[in-house]
């Protein structure tokens, strides 16, 4: 008889069930299920083949990126949030080529919906989408393959200065500029404010036919082989902004160790780092042989960047239609935000320039691209990443971006506290540097959300081996940082082939492999109005210690400072008493005197049992002590007017304002109550003594009881058990008066009677009383 096989796969075989199965087992660490379930594993490989290699051209290595975002099911404006995510962080003004597919239709697993974000046309307008720093990492064979693949989708355009042939190109772009673009490449389709559109694929030759006689005669169309030799290092820290610059050939890398800056318009980076010159021969899948290192002098000490910023700012203030500025402002630039080309091209480079090559007038001199200075993209964002936190608010991001560019000398566009850029430019550039982080904040009228990168699926296009990178959350799955470690597993999840990398190393090693990035959305707040009010609050900076996972306006958050827990059921008299005593407190106990009032979980606002634990946070040493503490917490005495309040039946606690320093007395309540309990136990254990000794002991005990009545009354005890009959009679709770001599005599008489009954050995009364105490 065959053994029954236990099947743990309860997911459907559609795309939603496939990725729910994959993410569930990945989060649980059940790698055996990911390998052993042949049905789901076959569906996974079929999905990757259909989305990564849709054109059946496997050798092309498209370096495609797919985003799979998991959004909680209680977020109803999911599509709108994803559009905001794409527009603000990826600078995608036009979303008609991007497909946002909702995979969850019938079954919703793990209370989350899955969305697939793909761009089959141009890979989110950047073939190097979501890569850190790499310069000409593709070899000539891969570049030619990319050219062939891109030519099948988008033909290379022929640009002319004739207004009749191309009406979208305005006259503010001169023919001299377009005649020099044939040595560079542009990426994607970008739509600016003047509705001018450039469409040319990455690493595709742009042959320019110049019809203007004033164009430069030295610039002629080049062959594809020459284009590959002087390949444009179109790489970016993230997303869809291109960095068009030339890189010298491999034998000439040695002179770059000590570069000389020949152009005054170029302002290097603020920091000085060692950057990796990514000139790899072949793409490697399992090993990382290392690449040549070059010293990048990011900034010279004798170089002042402030004068250059003012020079850039003065150029921007000129007339936008001046042809002399347009011709002199030609440069090979790499800017974060693509500003409107109605202004000069130099203004866009003065706004947000991360790295650029030598600049100059093409009419006056021929630029030696071979000796152009190479600056890694990482050198320009090192200071930003080091100062970033995982939960960065939009205003903090805004201040960080402006501060970073001011320090680097690139010109943040501020002069005497006035901003030059409008809101549209800021909204498209503030998040560009921060989008590389595994944690991305989205603040809108819909709410305050955070996208956290949890894992990455990578496939080798040659061997079809599937790699899995998992971020180590350190017990914080909703918080991410650039300093987190990533574990890179092979297709078998073997522990012998496990690599620990950073996110930068991971994306740099597997830079030419297609990837699927798994993001998880975290709800910080459901309403954006609360967040905006918190941003306007000047005390917001002091709240850095509070976790972002809690609501910003929460009144139920607990601090690390020592607190005194108060009962949840208190009346107005107790509140008035607390307010009066705060002004009179001498501050003997600083930790207790700082508390202005009770801070508790209110059952009407939070239906949980946590309040029960807070009530019993203080312990007692005996049942007798508990009984006296409960009695003293129920009954309060007014020393000024000698009014007696009987609350034993109602169970309400009232503290009058005439009692001095209750917080100080409260700190000594345990000691006083324990002393009284010890004396009571000692007295019960003693043998019968003389009558004089009994009277003297009773007087001392009465004094202790009187002094401890108010000290043990700050914390209300549980109301589930009634006060024992014996202790009720001993305390004199049934008497109308309590502070007179008559009450003292009555108290003394009752204590003596209790002693006599005990010494006489009356069985019935003695046993009942002892049972009441026990």
Curated annotation (Swiss-Prot):
One Gene Ontology cellular component term attached to this UniProt record is: cytoplasm
Q: The organism sits in which domain of life?
A: Eukaryota
Residues with Phosphoserine modification: 165, 304, 616, 622, 707, 720
This chain's protein is named Protein GIS4
Q: Where is the composition biased (Basic residues)?
A: 680-689
Organism equals: Saccharomyces cerevisiae (strain ATCC 204508 / S288c) (Baker's yeast)
Enumerate composition-biased segments (Acidic residues): 222-233, 413-423, 577-591
**Gene Ontology terms: biological process:** intracellular monoatomic ion homeostasis; intracellular signal transduction
Enumerate the UniProt keywords alphabetically. Cytoplasm, Phosphoprotein
- Where's it found, cell-wise? Cytoplasm
Q: Where is this region: Disordered?
A: 145-269, 281-322, 338-367, 387-423, 557-603, 637-701
The residue ranges flagged as biased composition, category Basic and acidic residues, are: 311-321, 637-649
Q: What is this protein's function?
A: May be involved in the Ras/cAMP signaling pathway.
Q: Which residue stretches does the UniProt record annotate as biased composition, category Low complexity? A: 180-218, 338-358, 667-679
A further note on this protein reads: Present with 222 molecules/cell in log phase SD medium.
Q: List compositional bias (Polar residues) regions by residue number.
A: 159-179, 234-244, 260-269, 284-297, 557-566
